[in-house]
Swiss-Prot record:
Record: residues binding substrate: 190, 192
Gene3D superfamilies documented for this protein: Spore Coat Polysaccharide Biosynthesis Protein SpsA, Chain A
Catalysed transformations (reactions): GDP-mannose + (glucomannan)n = GDP + (glucomannan)n+1
Keyword Nucleus: no
Designated gene of the protein: CSLA9
Domain of life: Eukaryota
Protein name, UniProt field: Probable glucomannan 4-beta-mannosyltransferase 9
Record keywords, A-Z: Cell wall biogenesis/degradation, Glycosyltransferase, Golgi apparatus, Membrane, Transferase, Transmembrane, Transmembrane helix
UniProt source species: Oryza sativa subsp. japonica
UniProt xrefs under SUPFAM superfamilies: Nucleotide-diphospho-sugar transferases (SSF53448)
Family: Belongs to the glycosyltransferase 2 family. Plant cellulose synthase-like A subfamily.
Length: 527
């Protein structure tokens, strides 16, 4: 028996050697080459955007210098006086849509902010689209709407008997009401968004004075960025998206993805593009791409910020990232041919949308992060015959990381944590991206991102604090624990048999996977 036990490992080792040289080594070398190629593509894209951003600031290509945006002024001093109704005619009719679904903790935020916008009361309609399934919450929202209506605000509370199309379906149904025909523009805010009173005064002029502009997008500002380390990581990623990606798209091609909220659309442009469609989980990006292909221009206002809330639980954040990664990949699959054959936009804009906007940022950016740093690099430790050039695993990633940090300078000291966290999240983003490209599994899964508002503060007052307890099934993430074990094994192998080049990175990444795997990330909400 002892002899047989000794022979088995030798047989396994012999089989491994027979397979490794002709099969595993060539495949791993091919994987390294593919990852290096994708890394170069990502590197070039980051450098390109940084150069454009520097040019925008150096040459003053701000929206207010490129487009006319004179303030809209009424003839009378008191714009809300019924006797001066004609004076308000200079102000276009604006519809404000607030889609919500069981938003118990935050529904008052957006309703109150929308009703407090500085705009003539007879030239704005607030439309609350309530898809809530909880009757108690529906009643609370309706009561809040009636409260504002009693103050003279033109507010409409709209419900439907199904949730077909989810958010896209609610927005589409909202546009069918008769009173919408009188509106020229529509501003959209999710339930946790709180625009400042001057939001319409700063966005509508771009649309009024520039008939070729379809969309004005504002930047998100996060009220709970300091809640936990996970929200700080999100702030870094989203600040880069807004300060760099959106700014570059707006400045170079007058095109970028609509963020689904904190933006104002020209209704005629929406209708020309085909309106809201629910074929993917990114109805906002879908509409933006279709409108862009019709020749419409978009403007991003980086200095106009709208307060919002980041998901602070890991479960909510993971669902959000699945939707944000799966949707664009699926939309790319559906629209690639349509974009390539479009006749209304220039060749350079088509290349930008296909290559820069979709391929590099929405697909390659997710895949290379996970495959290269969480699969291929550890595998080369186990198979020393395959080497990665230093420029591929040191220089390019370092430069890309530094360029990513320009969005949030205040979090520069968290850069290492951000890299490790993003590598973990790339696992879920890659999985979602492949689901979207292949159109399988959870491709159209829509889960509303949970926002806590002040709920946790109310549940956990300082004087009666109890350690939150969670069910073990809610906390443990088996996939992350599996990768933690894999990376830890590779790190130990590198120290014992390799050159030790990667061991520090592998152990740090393994620890990060483990921490997230056991659920100690984000805000823990007690049951």
């Amino acid at each position: 028996m002892a002899a047989a036990g000794a022979v088995l490992p030798e047989q396994i080792a012999a089989m491994w050697e027979q397979v490794k040289a002709p099969v595993v080594v060539p495949l791993l070398r091919l994987s390294v080459a593919a990852c290096l190629a994708m890394s170069v593509m990502l590197f070039v894209e980051k450098v390109y955007m940084s150069v454009v951003l520097v040019g925008v600031h150096l040459f003053g290509r701000r929206p207010d210098r490129r487009y006319r945006c004179d303030p809209i002024v009424a003839a009378g001093a008191d714009n809300d006086d019924p006797e001066l109704a004609d004076a308000n005619a200079a102000f276009p009719m604006v519809l404000i849509q607030i889609p919500m679904y069981n938003e118990r903790e935050v529904y008052k935020l957006s309703i109150g902010a929308a009703c407090g916008l500085s705009w003539p009361s007879d030239r704005v309609i607030v439309q609350v689209l309530d898809d809530s399934t909880d009757p108690v919450i529906k009643e609370m929202v309706q009561v809040e709407c009636k409260r504002w209506e009693s103050k003279g605000v033109r507010i409409k509370y709209e419900i439907r008997d199904n949730r077909v199309g989810y958010k896209a379906g609610a927005l589409r149904e909202g546009m069918k009401h008769g009173y919408v025909r009188d509106c020229d523009y529509v501003a959209i805010f999710d339930a946790d968004f709180q625009p400042d009173p001057d939001f319409l005064a700063r966005t509508i002029p771009f649309l009024v004075h520039n008939p070729d502009i379809a969309l004005v997008q504002a930047r998100w500002k996060f009220v709970n960025a300091n809640e936990c380390l996970m929200t700080r990581m999100q702030e870094m990623s989203l600040d880069y998206h807004f300060k760099v990606e959106q700014e570059v798209g707006s400045s170079t091609h007058a095109f970028f993805g609509f963020n689904g909220t904190a933006g104002v659309w020209r209704i005629s442009a929406m209708n020309e593009a085909g309106g809201w469609k629910d074929r993917t989980t990114v109805e906002d990006m879908d509409l933006a791409v279709r409108a862009g292909l019709k020749g419409w221009k978009f403007v991003y206002l980086g200095d106009l910020m709208v307060k919002s809330e980041l998901p602070s639980t890991f479960k909510a954040f993971r669902y959000q990232q699945h939707r944000w990664s799966c949707g664009p990949a699926n939309l790319f699959r559906k629209m690639l041919v349509e974009i390539a054959t479009n006749k209304k936009v220039t060749l350079w804009k088509k290349i930008y949308v296909i290559y820069n906007f979709f391929l590099v940022r929405k697909i390659i950016g997710h895949i290379v992060t996970f495959v290269f740093y969480c699969l291929v690099v550890p595998a080369t430790v186990l198979i020393p015959e395959v080497e990665i050039p230093r420029w591929g695993y040191v220089y390019l990633p370092s430069i890309v990381t530094i360029l990513n940090s320009i969005g949030t300078p205040r979090s520069l000291h968290l850069l290492i944590f951000w890299v490790l966290f993003e590598n973990v999240m790339s696992l879920h983003r890659t999985k979602a991206t492949l689901i979207g490209l292949l159109e399988t599994g959870r491709v159209n899964e829509w889960v509303v991102t949970e926002k806590l508002g002040d709920a946790l503060k109310l549940k956990l007052p300082g004087k009666a604090f109890r350690r939150p307890r969670m069910r073990i099934g809610d906390r443990v993430n088996a996939l992350e624990l599996g990768f933690s074990a894999y990376l830890s094994f590779c790190g130990c192998y590198d120290i014992a048999y390799g050159k030790g080049y990667y061991s520090l990175f592998l152990f740090l990444q393994s620890i990060t996977f483990f921490i997230i795997g056991v659920g100690y990330v984000g805000t823990i909400v007690p049951h």
